[in-house]
Swiss-Prot record:
Swiss-Prot/TrEMBL GO biological process terms: thiamine diphosphate biosynthetic process
Pathway(s) this gene product operates in, as recorded in its UniProt entry: Cofactor biosynthesis; thiamine diphosphate biosynthesis
Organism lineage: Bacteria, Bacillati, Actinomycetota, Actinomycetes, Propionibacteriales
Function as written in the Swiss-Prot or TrEMBL entry: Catalyzes the rearrangement of 1-deoxy-D-xylulose 5-phosphate (DXP) to produce the thiazole phosphate moiety of thiamine. Sulfur is provided by the thiocarboxylate moiety of the carrier protein ThiS. In vitro, sulfur can be provided by H(2)S.
Protein name according to UniProt: Thiazole synthase
Transferase found in the keyword field: yes
The entry's keywords: Cytoplasm, Schiff base, Thiamine biosynthesis, Transferase
């Protein structure tokens, strides 16, 4: 098998989370969409196979059509506990989701405050421990602290989901070093969650070694949600292929891509030679 074939094979490897087998590494959210028709077209354009839905919004009426869209396109629903501030509320919401949707999957969110929407690590760890003990497949939304991410893995979470930046800010990945540390230490999938604003940032997440990217606002609030969904799909694929293909090492000094043998005029000066005449 050629190097090209090996890289393609590695980049095409399915993502496994719990009992899920996903060929798309782009996970979509539904928050922020103003039109069910646009949301549906964006989800299809993204190629996603797993999409989050906030259970606190689950009610009869327009929100029901989200589940109809997912069923129509065979997209797995990932209920989340968005809006929960305590472990108790998150556990209650997860149990309601299991009863309503007949699934053990849950994206666990326990936020500290409305201004940052960042996780409360104490409540998050408490909720994760109890949900795992009750046979939930927990995908935990966490901050970019490698210690907390490792703790969640040790508790039995099926995936850890560090934030690139606060939800909805579009600030991208504020601490790529910490994301790399989380990836290097993890033995479960790492999913970059929150903060993505454009396609290049989704690519960067995959280049850093994340196994998938979850985003919502970057698509639902874009000027052209369907076009942005397509861009995100390609960005995740490109980032994954770049990661598995292996980037060149960074160097302090230039290195010519072509040999200097056979140069007709001039000479090559070393880095210490003076350029002045």
């Amino acid at each position: 098998m050629s190097c090209d074939e090996k890289a393609a094979t590695s980049s095409d490897e399915p993502l496994r989370i719990g009992g899920l087998r996903l060929t798309s590494r782009l996970i979509m959210g539904t928050g922020g969409s103003t039109s069910m028709d646009t949301l549906e077209r964006a989800l299809v354009a993204s190629g996603t196979q797993l999409t989050t839905v906030a259970m606190r919004r689950f009610a009869a009426g327009p929100r029901q059509s989200v589940f109809e869209i997912l069923q129509r396109h065979r997209i797995t629903a990932l209920p989340n506990t968005a809006g929960c501030y305590t472990a108790r509320d998150a556990i209650l919401t997860a149990n309601l989701a299991r009863e309503a949707l007949d699934t053990n999957l849950v994206k666990l969110e326990v936020i500290a405050d409305e201004d940052t929407l960042l996780p409360d690590p104490v409540e998050l760890v408490n909720a994760a421990e109890q949900l795992v003990a009750n046979d939930f497949v927990v995908l935990a939304y966490t901050n970019d602290d490698p210690a907390i991410a490792k703790r969640l893995e040790d508790l039995g979470c099926a995936a850890v989901m560090p934030a690139g930046a606060p939800i909805g800010t579009g600030l991208g990945i504020l601490n790529p070093h910490n994301i790399e540390l989380i990836v290097d230490r993890a033995n479960v999938p790492v999913i970059l969650d929150a903060g993505i604003g454009t396609a290049s940032e989704a690519t960067l997440a995959m280049e850093l070694g994340c196994d998938a990217v979850l985003l919502a606002s970057a698509v639902t609030r874009a000027h052209n949600p369907v076009g942005m969904a397509q861009a995100m799909k390609m960005a995740v694929v490109a980032g994954r292929m770049a990661r598995t293909s292996g980037r060149i090492p960074r160097r302090r000094l230039a290195r010519a891509s072509s040999p200097f043998d056979g140069i007709i005029t001039g000479r090559v000066r070393g880095p210490r030679e003076n350029d002045s005449l």
